[in-house]
Amino acid sequence: MNSRLVLLLAVSVALVSAIAVGNRSSHLKKSKECSSDGHTERCEYTGDLTVKTDSTCNHSTYIMTKVTPPNESPSNGVAHCRTAPCNSEDYADVDCLVAFGADNIAAIEKQ
């Protein structure tokens, strides 16, 4: 009887875990555009991430401008991210690590 209880608990945990995860897909689109005036180079890194989990869909944007050699701007090299439900223009600022994850940020910045 004790082994049946353990088996029942294991099956219950597996079912709850499968329900919690759901069907998830994501698509990352990234780009890097640079320009130079002969003294400095200005590069803009952008990323668009769409994440769908079951019936929920979110779209996040990433933008970072990096000037080299570094300038005095406090925003130089600092990423700004926003997120919104898919098919909405009601974006809210969000922490980039939360919206994109470390792997996607690395992919955007290593172009």
Swiss-Prot record:
The UniProt entry lists the main location of this chain as secreted
The keyword Glycoprotein appears for this protein: yes
Q: Supply one GO CC term from the record.
A: extracellular region
One matching Pfam family: DUF1505
The record's subcellular location field reads:
Secreted
Establish whether keyword Secreted is in the entry. Answer: yes
What keywords does the record list, in alphabetical order? Answer: Glycoprotein, Secreted, Signal
> Glycosylated at which positions?
23, 58
Q: Which residues form the signal peptide?
A: 1-18
State the similarity comment: Belongs to the UPF0375 family.
Question: What protein is this chain from?
Answer: UPF0375 protein ule-4
Natural source organism: Caenorhabditis elegans
